[in-house]
Amino acid sequence: MSELFKKLMDQIEMPLEIKNSSVFSSADIIEVKVHSLSRLWEFHFSFPELLPIEVYRELQTRLVNSFEKADIKATFDIRAETIDFSDDLLQDYYQQAFCEPLCNSASFKSSFSQLKVHYNGSQMIISAPQFVNNNHFRQNHLPRLEQQFSLFGFGKLAIDMVSDEQMTQDLKSSFETNREQLLEKANQEAMQALEAQKSLEDSAPPSEEVTPTQNYDFKERIKQRQAGFEKAEITPMIEVTTEENRIVFEGMVFSVERKTTRTGRHIINFKMTDYTSSFAMQKWAKDDEELKKYDMISKGSWLRVRGNIENNNFTKSLTMNVQDIKEIVHHERKDLMPADQKRVEFHAHTNMSTMDALPTVESLIDTAAKWGHPAIAITDHANVQSFPHGYHRAKKAGIKAIFGLEANIVEDKVPISYNEVDMNLHEATYVVFDVETTGLSAANNDLIQIAASKMFKGNIIEQFDEFIDPGHPLSAFTTELTGITDNHVRGSKPILQVLQEFQNFCQGTVLVAHNATFDVGFMNANYERHNLPLITQPVIDTLEFARNLYPEYKRHGLGPLTKRFQVALEHHHMANYDAEATGRLLFIFLKEARENRDVTNLMELNTKLVAEDSYKKARIKHATIYVQNQVGLKNIFKLVSLSNVKYFEGVARIPRSVLDAHREGLLLGTACSDGEVFDALLSNGIDAAVTLAKYYDFIEVMPPAIYRPLVVRDLIKDEVGIQQIIRDLIEVGRRLDKPVLATGNVHYIEPEDEIYREIIVRSLGQGAMINRTIGRGEDAQPAPLPKAHFRTTNEMLDEFAFLGKDLAYEIVVTNTNTFADRFEDVEVVKGDLYTPFVDRAEERVAELTYAKAFEIYGNPLPDIIDLRIEKELASILGNGFAVIYLASQMLVQRSNERGYLVGSRGSVGSSFVATMIGITEVNPMPPHYVCPNCQHSEFITDGSCGSGYDLPNKNCPKCGTLYKKDGQDIPFETFLGFDGDKVPDIDLNFSGDDQPSAHLDVRDIFGEEYAFRAGTVGTVAEKTAFGFVKGYERDYNKFYNDAEVERLATGAAGVKRSTGQHPGGIVVIPNYMDVYDFTPVQYPADDMTAAWQTTHFNFHDIDENVLKLDILGHDDPTMIRKLQDLSGIDPSNILPDDPDVMKLFSGTEVLGVTEEQIGTPTGMLGIPEFGTNFVRGMVNETHPTTFAELLQLSGLSHGTDVWLGNAQDLIKEGIATLSTVIGCRDDIMVYLMHAGLQPKMAFTIMERVRKGLWLKISEDERNGYIQAMRDNNVPDWYIESCGKIKYMFPKAHAAAYVLMALRVAYFKVHYPIFYYCAYFSIRAKAFELRTMSAGLDAVKARMKDITEKRQRNEATNVENDLFTTLELVNEMLERGFKFGKLDLYRSHATDFIIEEDTLIPPFVAMEGLGENVAKQIVRAREDGEFLSKTELRKRGGVSSTLVEKFDEMGILGNLPEDNQLSLFDDFF
């Protein structure tokens, strides 16, 4: 037994006979984990063998009980050196398991605890009745049981269940018997009730007229039950923790899910909260008619429910089986003041305040408008990302939005010395002093010790040390922090005498302190209080001295510095020790300054040492900044930008001089308790606060509830102190004749939302200032957060009632309204599109268009071409879109010149001008022939052909040349709208390899100062919020049921967490304006090393005002380029109607394999757009044979409710075919126009359908469209299909993707080894080289293994990706090609290489081997062979683990461990 274990056993008073037993002979404590916040101690014990069950229970009882006395929860687990046990011991521990937290759920315990177990030599077997031996218990409970047995010391004991037939029959018989008894009892109770009712009726007086009645009136019984339900007592949800009957809850629904069973019954699973907790509910409806009765069960509705609380197998938690339900009225908070007496909130945060506030700007504005407030100000922390949404919502709500932010203000330079004089630093006498206080507020806390060392040339020549009695007992926190007790201060000199003596002590010296602003501020406040002169002599702050001498140090506190410079500090936070240590540091700093910085004079400390970037370490003070007019808007954009891109250090900072330079059009408020005016008032008194408040335009005061955490932090004594601070702030305003505004520091809307903010804030950990703890050791806890909900006018007046009615009304209502009137309306988001100016852009677009059109179609142009170009150019040039087209054309051309194709996305392929100038390959004209020799053309305009690629080959009748075929029949309206004025969104797919170059092209074309990455805002996702809730639950000893966890996670989600950038979006600012006309800028995720700045606003907020280019990276262009490099074939010359390629969609014969060999009936594996399981299934069902049908498939697979439950059924039932169903959005307009509808109506119907609005528009509007379609013989199935669609894919997008896919497919058919090489190099996501190079049998076996895992839902994401790779490996091998092994001297770093009919994998295909190491291996082998494994590790940078893997796979051959020649290196 170890000494530590023995000591623990003695402490918990373990019985002597157990301590002396053999099982404790070599017991030990392996580890103890202490969780301070949750007060949990986890013990990990080691024993020579398993403990007898009675010893285990004794140990558990005594350990838990002993620690409980200290309010600590103790748990333990055991590692047994020898695991040997009997069935009896196994059964004992099995019973014990259900007393442990892991296994004590009611359903598990009730079903399993009485079962028998035995050990069969390899597993513990549980004999169970058949209905218990099911997947639910296996998946949800057996793993817990295995885990618990591991904690008992049984190691990795496998557990399984077997069905016991006898037990099953016995339980069935028992159940039937009990059921009969229950039915009999129920009948007896019913008869007794009827007899009692009859007895009452017999004893009642006879009525004048007797009407025969039934003995049992069902409707009356329901009515009585309902009356009882409405009067029933409401149970708070938090009080229900076990199964109970006839419980009544009231609450709000926050989650609803409806399901229909195979029998047609409906289940409504919903969750409600009453804000004490939450509960899962379940309500059944027998049919559709009954289901309609429960339409009130919807998200946000308030209900009263009654039912039984049961453990539910489906929800896996306590769930109410709802019997009665009723919608109730929820009385929301209202602003009760008259309409002309409503306040204005001037300090409100939205969910854009990073990890700090909850409401969306829309919800804040809506609430203010609902309450009748005339205006509301938005003041997020250091950002303005809510401005655009706030601007739009305020206009909609008819309320004035005042736009602002709560800024982090810092001084430009923080001085080292104050009150400088011309003095030789090395001839001066210094008084190095420190004070100890009862708190941080000079105005509210007391001095309790002043200590100082008078020093000359590094020697202490005199000391001062006096305690001061504050006149009240010291707090436990003060005593614990400083070591000063009431005995130290009791009987000490009067404070006036101590202050006078200290002033005398300091005469003629330089004062020195660490963080001198605090110590000097405290001294001056006390000097002023006792009418003594303030400090005027020089002061040196060693904190700033250290920061400027040693900026590379992370911490400059007294403790870290004394450790670094080996200066003794015996009792930190006792003034005498701190002062002496600070003095020793001072002379170290003076020596460094003299010898290495040439600083010898006091005047030089600030001029030579204070760094230009000292603002980075300056203390942050909050200020609220508001936009008064349009000039102010641009200035606030500039301030936000500078704070993020130039002055960012931990947070976005605004140096005071920068604020001064941009103050026009802005108004400033003093902000919260972190503002400098409040801090000065707290620390130095009202006069200091008045001096600082001159800088501001108004004074903020907040409700006492906002300041209460300061009491807990010992900054303010009590509620009276809070009220006095508020009165003092009002006095500051009165002295300066500045308005005082009552503001709410709003962080959430409803009081009950407080918990969500608590969870978000606490997730930041103790490193966040807001979570800094109060107290020390185990008792340390963060201060409570303030009650920061959005208050109504009457609630705000109540908060300030202590001021008297008139003064409260003045600061809450009068002043806020008067000040709000000073703000002009501003245009945050512009109403027009502003594109860059490019010289002759319109002419160049027109010239390029006509030049290409003449080249293809001849001059003069066919009328159909000429009219289309004329129509498009009128829209493009007339609306200022030419620059957008020209910019895209230049980018595509540059990428083409670098050897890459560029694919188009979205609906840009609907524009024929885009086709002609080279932006897209998709030709949107009707299907047509055109002669490449004489330009003669023929157009098919009757809708009989869906794609020009499907036209039969034909020779030109004029010159005999084979016609070229083209045209996808896509109307221009689908790109720029029916009126051609919609801002074009041109999305382009560049090769991932070429994407960085394309991004730089934008800078080159438009200028770096006008090109920015499109910014994004990342918010807390619900899964992340779930983790925050569980962490909060753990750290703060909370216990939430699953429904409450879900509710809290939902409430905490959506808060801004970080910023980022769109993967391909670049915003271009017009070169006749600057970016601050539209948005501030910043770096993504505050990464100051990023190559690009981003828009501060989410790019969607300004995408209709500036040019946005989507320059996305995509695999298809990369793949095409790779295939071109391998084959030398120009992909643009590949015909899209290659008959062998089309055979891939109907079978596998063209690949030379069978369905059985490759596991799929078509050749779709690895073909872009068509290779997923979902689309392969569609191909199998439809067997497309034309390009037009492939477009249909692409549209059907990308749309929502277009295929499943819609087109799929129509095709199966023979109502429609693949070519006639609705596939792409554009087909609707084209089909309806061919049917005879007017273009405008055809366009409008298409827009309604593609956006899923068909069933949301008014019935009159919808009926009008239906009638028009029927009048033109559009079939009913087509109309019904329109009503089911939620989203549709653009045909131009489909055409671009299918065209790329067919080019890839061409190589798969005709040049297979090139195809597989390109696929594995670019598209494959996972590799398993050992399997891939082991031949067909190994590949098929691994695929079977993953398939079986998928069926059990056990396959990992990596295995799923690997399966896709192996499908292609299998196909390649079945086609007669080989997969080689990784080769140390032949493999490429990143690409597969071809050797005859074999693919050699690259180094990056090895699991765990990254690109950098792969390239290092290739570089190293160029310098000569590797002579040993050690040399491979050193020269190749390969880890030992990878070397072992190489060796296991036979890659290293007979390479020795060490280079034998190296043994003799020292001799040469």
From Swiss-Prot:
SUPFAM superfamilies: Nucleic acid-binding proteins, Ribonuclease H-like
Keyword Nuclease: yes
UniProt KW Hydrolase keyword: yes
Reactions mediated catalytically: DNA(n) + a 2'-deoxyribonucleoside 5'-triphosphate = DNA(n+1) + diphosphate
Enzyme Commission numbers on file: 2.7.7.7
Gene3D superfamilies per record: 1.10.150.870, 3.30.1900.20, 6.10.140.1510, Metal-dependent hydrolases (3.20.20.140), Nucleic acid-binding proteins (2.40.50.140), PolC, middle finger domain (1.10.150.700), Ribonuclease H-like superfamily/Ribonuclease H (3.30.420.10)
Pfam families per the UniProt record, alphabetical: DNA_pol3_a_NI (PF14480), DNA_pol3_a_NII (PF11490), DNA_pol3_alpha (PF07733), DNA_pol3_finger (PF17657), HHH_6 (PF14579), PHP (PF02811), RNase_T (PF00929), tRNA_anti-codon (PF01336)
UniProt region (Disordered), positions on chain: 197-217
GO BP: any one term: DNA-templated DNA replication
EC supergroup of this enzyme: transferase
Domain of life of the source: Bacteria
Family, per entry: Belongs to the DNA polymerase type-C family. PolC subfamily.
HAMAP family, per the entry: DNApol_PolC
Function: Required for replicative DNA synthesis. This DNA polymerase also exhibits 3' to 5' exonuclease activity.
Protein name listed in UniProt: DNA polymerase III PolC-type
Organism: Streptococcus agalactiae serotype V (strain ATCC BAA-611 / 2603 V/R)
Gene: polC
